[in-house]
């Protein structure tokens, strides 16, 4: 049933394509090593408006022969991910291989171009690192951080739902990652368990920036994402394509949906019919089970607010009583605890 409710929304009036509807097969074994290359300094991503001709700053920096290709880690609609080892120093990474013909046929060249541009310019311990990329006549390859414990969604399927302690720690890390992105004027626009990976130490890694966008003016009108996680303003755009513009608060709504799904085990607005799911979203029609604590329920209700500007801010999420209860120890702040927990795991 879980796979059946995770539909990727498509619309002829929006820049959305079908994507995977079931968990990827991800490995749980080898530990990542430290990357020996020199990282680029973090910079504001520039807006992308050109078709996909991926230009490398130094085309000779990377090539397929540099890597020993290992077992498959996952397969999506348009790409495959493999465990790979850099031949010179043994550095383990994930190599995402995209085929140009498939990208062109699906008309998502700009999406991939934007993903590369944005993800290569962000540096945060809770965001999956893109070390570099290269291409040949047939393929575009992304060199990604290897998240050894795989997909959050796979773990959620296995456990059914998470404890509130685990959920709160994941949500706190997500809030820190989103705060970092929003300060750089980046909207992720596709937050869901399938797009969150888990590192070797249990820290989360926000991934899949295919629908993300750099938007300094903070107003957009393109519908994209996954139906269960769409905000009310995006649903309104589906019905009246030119009537609404939205900003980064759509990520706050998605964070609320994620919080609910982690502690309950399914999205809050699920219905067997998509039209009813849309209706429930536009009315914020949800029922929080009695086993959910009052603190968790309060945070969910403060994020899943119909009026975008009334949703809890990321700062309010980070200092919410539910987060403090499960993340704070020895009177330190939640930020200090989680910063210490991730500082030793981030790559230099």
Each model region followed by its residue ranges:
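Conserved N-lobe beta3->alphaC-helix segment of eukaryotic protein kinase catalytic domains
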Residues: 97-122
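Activation segment signature within eukaryotic-like protein kinase domains
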Residues: 170-171
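Conserved N-lobe ATP-binding subsite of Hanks-type protein kinase domains
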Residues: 80
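Conserved short submotifs of the Hanks-type protein kinase catalytic core
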Residues: 138-151, 155
């Amino acid at each position: 049933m879980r796979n059946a409710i995770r539909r990727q929304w498509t619309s002829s009036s929006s820049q959305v394509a079908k994507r995977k509807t079931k968990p990827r097969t991800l490995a749980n074994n080898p530990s990542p090593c430290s990357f020996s290359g020199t990282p680029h300094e973090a910079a504001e991503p520039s807006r992308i408006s050109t078709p996909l001709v991926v230009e490398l700053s130094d085309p000779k920096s990377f090539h397929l022969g540099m890597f020993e290709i290992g077992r498959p880690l996952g397969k999506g609609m348009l790409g495959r991910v493999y465990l790979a080892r850099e031949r010179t120093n043994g550095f383990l990474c994930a190599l995402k291989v995209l085929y140009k013909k498939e990208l062109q046929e699906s008309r998502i060249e700009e999406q991939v171009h934007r993903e590369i541009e944005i993800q290569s310019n962000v540096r945060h311990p809770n965001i999956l690192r893109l070390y570099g990329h290269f291409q040949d006549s047939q393929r575009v390859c992304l060199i990604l951080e290897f998240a050894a414990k795989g997909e959050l969604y796979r773990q959620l399927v296995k456990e059914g739902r998470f404890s509130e302690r685990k959920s709160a720690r994941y949500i706190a890390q997500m809030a820190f990652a989103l705060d970092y992105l929003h300060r750089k004027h980046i909207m992720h626009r596709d937050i869901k368990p399938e797009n969150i990976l888990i590192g070797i130490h249990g820290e989360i890694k926000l991934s899949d920036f295919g629908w993300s966008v750099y938007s300094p003016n903070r107003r957009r009108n393109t519908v994209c994402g996954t139906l269960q996680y769409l905000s009310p303003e995006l649903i309104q755009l589906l019905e009246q394509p030119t009537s609404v513009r939205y900003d980064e608060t759509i990520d706050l709504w998605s964070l609320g949906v994620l919080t609910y799904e982690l502690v309950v085990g399914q999205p809050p607005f699920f219905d067997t019919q998509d039209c009813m799911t849309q209706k429930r979203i536009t009315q914020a029609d949800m029922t929080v089970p009695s086993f959910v604590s009052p603190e968790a329920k309060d945070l969910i209700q403060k994020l899943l607010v119909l009026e975008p500007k009334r949703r809890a801010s990321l700062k309010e999420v980070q200092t919410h009583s539910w987060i403090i209860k499960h993340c704070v120890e020895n009177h330190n702040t939640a930020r200090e605890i989680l910063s210490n927990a991730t500082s030793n795991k981030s790559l230099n």
